[in-house]
Curated annotation (Swiss-Prot):
Name of the protein this chain belongs to: UPF0262 protein Nham_0287
Similarity comment: Belongs to the UPF0262 family.
Originating species: Nitrobacter hamburgensis (strain DSM 10229 / NCIMB 13809 / X14)
Pfam family, one: UPF0262
Coiled-coil stretches: none
Length: 164
């Protein structure tokens, strides 16, 4: 008899994401496009289970306050669940590297050869993966997220962190 893994509770998910407008830096159309796609993809498919909160679904407000990343987690009816403040220090170098390579990527797609674009994109994805793993580590014991959810959240954190 084979064992099947337990099915994830479909209530352990985000149904809405809000980015704090005061936290969002000026950005160009490429960054705005990344943000819109990340929010759409995140809401479409995610695993998000705050420790000890029971099931959701949840809404998430993300902000930068001081030198901290704030995750304000609420139920769908806006009842508060928990607010987590995470230091931005572990993300600073990763976000800086991510945006440097994103700038190179956006320039390359206009003029470079397909091989050059692919090489830059592989580097971009590698840095993005590093940021996603760092976020999963920082959320460990607070909120359970799968890797794809962490990737989309890292994109949103990067948008907030980017100051144009």
């Amino acid at each position: 008899m084979s064992k099947t893994p337990p099915k994830e509770d479909s209530r352990n998910r985000i149904v809405a994401v809000m980015l704090d407008e005061d936290s969002i830096g000026r950005s160009g159309p490429d960054i705005e496009h990344e943000r819109a796609i990340a929010i759409y993809d995140l809401v479409e498919k995610n695993l998000f289970a705050p420790e000890g909160a029971g099931g959701g679904p949840f809404t998430l407000r993300i902000a930068i306050t001081g030198n901290r990343l704030m995750f304000d987690i609420r139920r769908e009816d806006d009842a508060p669940v928990v607010t987590h403040l995470l230091s931005l220090t572990p993300f600073r170098r990763i976000v800086k590297d991510y945006f440097m390579i994103c700038d190179s990527y956006y320039q390359a797609i206009r003029t470079a050869t397909p091989d050059k674009i692919e090489a830059i994109d592989m580097g971009r994805r590698g840095i993005h993966d590093e940021g996603s793993r760092t976020l999963q580590e920082r959320l460990n014991g607070k909120v359970r997220v799968d890797f794809e959810t962490a990737r989309r959240l890292f994109t949103l954190i990067s948008v907030l962190h980017w100051k144009g």
